[in-house]
Amino acid sequence: MAFLWLVSCFALVGATFGCGVPAIQPVLTGLSRIVNGEDAIPGSWPWQVSLQDRTGFHFCGGSLISENWVVTAAHCGVKTTDVVVAGEFDQGSDEENVQVLKIAQVFKNPKFNSFTVRNDITLLKLATPAQFSETVSAVCLPTVDDDFPAGTLCATTGWGKTKYNALKTPDKLQQAALPIVSEAKCKESWGSKITDVMICAGASGVSSCMGDSGGPLVCQKDGVWTLAGIVSWGSGFCSTSTPAVYARVTALMPWVQEILEAN
């Protein structure tokens, strides 16, 4: 009976689709265009979305933060003619029950600077809400005060290139576990390009790469997956010994809250 209760208890947790708790648990090696990553378990990163143009070309990733909102990188240059695809795992398959969602409004952070890549965040308001399910749900947003110290093991996901010179991106969603890198250590690679609105991770034999942009860097906090970073920029060769750079979500939360409350 105890086992039955446990199962129904887990079913209940899944049914509410709270943020940061996948109904299908991810399995990460080392926790477990991601270089040296691995295929994810289908549906285990339910907030991951693919941003596609009208031809169906995947150009960036993003994360669902609610039924109505997606967060991505400003440098992705999303337009209202693009679509958000939720619930996808294998982009080469027609068998998946995906949701193709139109974008009503694009809110690019007005302080985004394409030269310094500071404030690399855009919010997308969906024209119709995503239907939350076992394979589609939201990631938790951090508070301004949340801290993700150096060494924290986090995860990044995406359909980006698995080698910098690969001709195409992988069909199946890739994942990698990687540590947060201190600002001082990151500056050893990138110098003054690193600012307080960025957070670094990797240099551990894995890397984000072209096509992963806009996607999530998530860390577990109090048992839920929380969005610590948005894939922003890094080595042109997707070097696995150089940290990749992510927009620091905690530093951008005041702007996020302002947009969500006003809309």
UniProtKB/Swiss-Prot annotation:
SMART domains: Tryp_SPc. It catalyses: Preferential cleavage: Tyr-|-Xaa, Trp-|-Xaa, Phe-|-Xaa, Leu-|-Xaa. GO terms for biological process: digestion; proteolysis. Its main location: secreted. The keyword Glycoprotein does not apply. It is found in: Secreted, Extracellular space. Its EC number is 3.4.21.1. Residues 34-261 form the Peptidase S1 domain. Keywords: Digestion, Disulfide bond, Hydrolase, Phosphoprotein, Protease, Secreted, Serine protease, Signal, Zymogen. Residues 1-18 form the signal peptide. It comes from the Eukaryota. The modification Phosphoserine is found at S93. GO terms for cellular component: extracellular region. The active site is at H75 (charge relay system), D120 (charge relay system), S213 (charge relay system). InterPro entries: Peptidase_S1_PA, Peptidase_S1_PA_chymotrypsin, Peptidase_S1A, Trypsin_dom, TRYPSIN_HIS, TRYPSIN_SER. It is an enzyme of class 3 (hydrolase). Disulfide bonds join C19-C140, C60-C76, C154-C219, C186-C200, C209-C238. One of its GO terms (molecular function) is serine-type endopeptidase activity. It holds the Pfam family Trypsin. Belongs to the peptidase S1 family. PANTHER family: CHYMOTRYPSIN-RELATED, CHYMOTRYPSINOGEN B. This is Chymotrypsinogen B. It comes from Mus musculus. The lineage of its organism: Eukaryota, Metazoa, Chordata, Craniata, Vertebrata.
